[in-house]
């Protein structure tokens, strides 16, 4: 009989106890005495967020298909539970077995966003695992990190044994088999790590040394062991139809953020937005076969009982078999009484026709992401979306019965001027005017336009990785300019405006392009009490300011400084296919306000063609 790690007294006093009891529908249970490798798969945020993550669902299913591996799940305890565990000295446990995480062979942590870095330390701390990798022994799990933030792993280097660079379906089993062999041989932990570092895509920070120049930039990044490669190559699955995909995702006991079946239709994006990290990291664009997707949709709906299905992609409209897939899903979902969610669609005639059929027009809103207020700045960022297309799409939507529009913009983009900022208000006004051109008896109530601005953060492996970012007060000044210009518009009552927190954005920028020195501040901030920094109610900027000051870190060095063309970045040792030469060329083209065509229109020579697949070979086949 499985025994819960928490007694009834605790479960009755904490918020949402179902976060911690496991045993959900489709959770995988095994006999731990019959497996060779125990793997704790962690999302370092609250259960509802982590349970929504598709990547963990895929890897959980993939690992558990092997009889010799048992993969279990673990999430960050919410602050109330965190306090109980510390007060009562309860170690962090995995959901399936309820066993302490420290008893596992591996702790795999997916790192999706920078603001969860202190939660990673919480996971290690509550598990009784030394925070610093150099202090761990075979009594501790191998701590491995994956996900988009590992494309600059350096701020977290001292906390991880291994970073997995690339897509999870590639070399994990090779690592598991190596682990079994080395443990059977009685190898030391370091002997295992040295051999792991020879597996393509695996980065062991302890085996590399960084030297700095007097100005704080990197002078060199070199392996300390001759057997270790000088660079780490991203691992990628070229045929994403012939790979793992969950048939029966775990169904949470409580409502998750994404409480639905998720169908990943493709990876990558053909659009070369110069601010977008995902668009560069996941090149080349690869599509799943439509028949495979139809089969998976049916299997997952059967296995979960979910009442909604969503298509996952960076740009769903670019999926070449979208009409066939959507028509199938509409018929299948109508038969089952299931809703369809279609994010990342361009607003064109086909999309509007589909959305009319699958959405309640009175309740739903259409979303555009112009990103910039002027055509000049949209050309700088290579958005590929014109004012005419936006207004035409909004007009068709209004004529179709919609009256709610959401618009997403960024402030602080390279070369941005006051005219660009005010252009956000002017575009909102033009959309409102387009609505009120419709005869009154044909309108669906009052027009509601919501404009949201986030603040620009330069990310590694983008053309804007050389760019300076704004200070906190500069971001807020720009938001005020937009707000005041909106208030000056004729249809201001139809336009709502909100913006992201500027102080959080600056911290994200420091962590995104940080080096190993930043890791000391992460540790210090955690010691001061930083936790759940992505949640505004728990974010304390003073913890971070104190941490940077105590560590002698000048935060301006990581944020407002424009990088020189030849600077060595902390992440330059990672090769993602897309070359630094191409990114620099795009940085120059941005300043020239020159648009680069998308991958289906013309190859831009980014370097991803080396993988010999996906969109890079479409025109040749």
Mark where each language-model region is.
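Canonical Radical SAM [4Fe-4S] cluster-binding loop centered on the CxxxCxxC motif
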Residues: 53, 255-291, 602-620
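Glycine-rich beta-alpha loop elements in corrinoid/cobalamin-binding modules
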Residues: 77-223, 463-515, 522-537
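Conserved SAM/AdoMet-binding glycine-rich loop
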Residues: 41-42, 46, 115, 299-406, ...
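N-terminal [4Fe-4S]-dependent radical SAM core
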Residues: 10-40, 47-48, 205, 211-262, ...
């Amino acid at each position: 009989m499985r025994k819960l790690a928490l007694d009834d007294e605790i479960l009755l006093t904490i918020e949402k106890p179902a976060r911690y009891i496991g045993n959900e529908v489709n959770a995988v249970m095994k006999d731990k005495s019959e497996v060779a490798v125990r793997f704790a798969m962690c999302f370092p945020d609250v259960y509802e967020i982590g349970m929504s993550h598709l990547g963990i669902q895929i890897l959980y299913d993939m690992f558990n298909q092997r009889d010799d591996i048992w993969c279990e799940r673990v999430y960050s305890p919410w602050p109330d539970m965190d306090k109980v565990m510390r007060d009562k000295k309860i170690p962090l446990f995995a959901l399936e077995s309820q066993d302490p995480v420290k008893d596992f062979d591996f702790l795999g942590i997916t790192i999706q966003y920078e603001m969860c870095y202190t939660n990673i330390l919480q996971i290690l701390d509550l598990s009784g695992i030394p925070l610093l990798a150099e202090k761990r022994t075979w009594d501790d799990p191998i701590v491995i990190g994956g996900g988009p933030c590992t494309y600059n792993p350096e701020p977290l280097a001292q906390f991880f044994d291994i970073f997995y660079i690339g897509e999870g379906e590639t070399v994990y089993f090779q690592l598991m088999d190596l682990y079994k062999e080395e443990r059977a041989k009685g190898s030391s932990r370091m002997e295992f790590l040295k051999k792991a570092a020879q597996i393509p895509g695996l980065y062991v920070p302890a085996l590399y040394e960084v030297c700095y120049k007097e100005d704080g930039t990197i002078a060199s990044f070199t392996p300390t062991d001759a057997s270790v490669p000088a660079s780490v190559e991203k691992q990628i699955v070229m045929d994403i139809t012939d790979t793992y995909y969950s048939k029966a995702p775990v169904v949470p006991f409580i409502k998750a953020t994404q409480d639905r079946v998720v169908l990943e239709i493709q990876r990558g994006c053909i659009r070369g937005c110069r601010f977008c990290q995902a668009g560069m990291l996941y090149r080349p664009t690869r599509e799943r076969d439509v028949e495979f997707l139809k089969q998976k949709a049916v299997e997952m709906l059967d296995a979960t009982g979910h009442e909604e299905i969503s298509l996952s992609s960076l740009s769903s409209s670019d999926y070449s078999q979208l009409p066939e897939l959507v028509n199938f899903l509409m018929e299948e979902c109508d038969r089952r009484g299931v809703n369809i969610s279609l994010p990342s669609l361009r607003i064109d005639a086909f999309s509007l026709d589909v959305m009319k059929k699958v959405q309640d027009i009175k309740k739903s809103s259409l979303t555009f992401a112009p990103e910039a207020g002027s055509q000049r700045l949209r050309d700088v960022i290579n958005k590929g979306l014109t004012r005419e297309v936006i207004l035409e799409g909004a007009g068709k939507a209004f004529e179709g019965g919609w009256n709610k529009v959401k618009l997403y913009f960024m402030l602080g983009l390279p070369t941005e001027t006051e005219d660009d900022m005010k252009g956000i208000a002017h575009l909102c006004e033009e959309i409102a005017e387009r609505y009120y051109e419709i005869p009154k008896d044909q309108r669906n109530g009052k027009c509601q336009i919501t404009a949201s601005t986030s603040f620009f953060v330069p990310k590694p492996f983008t053309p804007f990785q050389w760019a300076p970012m704004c200070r906190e007060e500069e971001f807020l000044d720009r938001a005020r300019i937009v707000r005041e210009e909106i208030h000056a518009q004729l249809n201001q009552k139809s336009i709502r405006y909100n913006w992201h927190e500027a102080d959080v954005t600056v911290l994200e920028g420091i962590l995104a392009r940080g080096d190993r020195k930043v890791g000391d501040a992460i540790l210090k901030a955690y010691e001061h009490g930083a936790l759940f920094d992505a949640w505004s109610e728990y974010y304390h900027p003073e913890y971070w300011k104190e941490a940077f000051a105590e560590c002698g870190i000048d935060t301006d060095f990581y944020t407002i400084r424009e990088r020189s063309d030849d600077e060595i970045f902390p992440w330059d040792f990672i090769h993602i296919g897309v070359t630094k030469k191409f990114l620099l060329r795009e940085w120059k083209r941005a300043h020239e306000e020159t648009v680069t065509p998308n991958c289906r229109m013309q190859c831009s020579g980014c370097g991803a063609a080396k993988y010999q697949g996906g969109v890079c070979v479409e025109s040749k086949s």
